[in-house]
């Protein structure tokens, strides 16, 4: 995904349009081989988490929901944030 200045309203709407486009591409798994699919999914999730880190507060974030359900360990998210 390209880089966006998410502080700007126009950039946020462009970001979400790009996000929706990537979801549509990911939904067509038969058009992609497994490696490309996993790479695109990884890039999509990385960018989504980066967005949430800056703009989503409280218990609404995907990271908080995954942690609550035991699908994401706290140590893995702490390590990931330190690496960025």
Swiss-Prot record:
InterPro entries: C-protein (IPR016407). C protein is one of the proteins involved in the production and packaging of viral single-stranded DNA. GO terms for biological process: viral DNA genome packaging. It comes from the Viruses. This is C protein. Pfam families: Phage_C. It comes from Escherichia phage G4 (Bacteriophage G4). The lineage of its organism: Viruses, Monodnaviria, Sangervirae, Phixviricota, Malgrandaviricetes.
């Amino acid at each position: 995904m390209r880089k966006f200045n998410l502080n700007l309203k126009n950039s946020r709407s462009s970001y979400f349009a790009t996000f929706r486009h990537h979801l549509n591409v990911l939904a067509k798994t038969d058009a992609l081989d497994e490696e490309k699919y996993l790479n695109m999914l990884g890039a999509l999730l990385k960018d989504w988490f980066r967005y949430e880190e800056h703009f989503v507060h409280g218990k609404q974030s995907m990271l908080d929901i995954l942690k609550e359900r035991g699908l994401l360990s706290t140590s893995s998210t702490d390590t990931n944030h330190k690496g960025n």
